[in-house]
């Protein structure tokens, strides 16, 4: 980190923009590795995008008309129908929570991912020079804490519905007697099933984090290597391509959530 008033080197610029505003950076906890060290910027922007989603959809729902709908209502209805169709095709149980959950995840992840299209210094520069905030990362889904928290939330629902639908005994039987239905294979079955079970939230969270973090790094590298008046030459093509990544990652996270919860609702003898 450069001294106050001193220009950052390329490596310093990259390191600065990859650093979260945390309680440790503000001296409120002793260690970066502390359990209580919260990434304030990731938490703020994840809550902000979540509240934005709720506000937009609530506003549209209150003003919805059976007559000629406005452009925003048409757009929201298109998203709702898209998610509902995917839930109908993929989820084979009966649970009124799944469609709203899938809609929330899809829209929330898209909004968090879209923060990656905000110019690199658009928010961090005024935050640092006008508000005295030393670090600011604006892409919540490029923070492994956020993506793994969402994945662990899905994992908790998987376990809850597996036990609720199959019973504790049925869930234990599924772990112990699959894929090989013989008592002597129980230890091997347990090892395979537990690894498979734990891999689901890990892959779910890390896939989203890895793709969004990589995209953020590319934008930072472009900003660090080119003068401000030429940055658009590299940033614009990457941003256009990155829009596809943003949408695909939100869709994948939503679909895997639906698939995992559908598996949790399946009868253990299915």
Curated annotation (Swiss-Prot):
CDD domains with a match to the protein in the record: ATP-synt_Fo_a_6
GO function terms (MF aspect): proton-transporting ATP synthase activity, rotational mechanism
Residues that span the membrane, as ranges: 37-57, 98-118, 143-163, 217-237, 239-259
Designated name of the protein: ATP synthase subunit a
A single BP term in Gene Ontology: proton motive force-driven plasma membrane ATP synthesis
Predominant cellular place of this UniProt entry's protein: membrane
The protein's assembly and partners: F-type ATPases have 2 components, CF(1) - the catalytic core - and CF(0) - the membrane proton channel. CF(1) has five subunits: alpha(3), beta(3), gamma(1), delta(1), epsilon(1). CF(0) has three main subunits: a(1), b(2) and c(9-12). The alpha and beta chains form an alternating ring which encloses part of the gamma chain. CF(1) is attached to CF(0) by a central stalk formed by the gamma and epsilon chains, while a peripheral stalk is formed by the delta and b chains.
Function statement: Key component of the proton channel; it plays a direct role in the translocation of protons across the membrane.
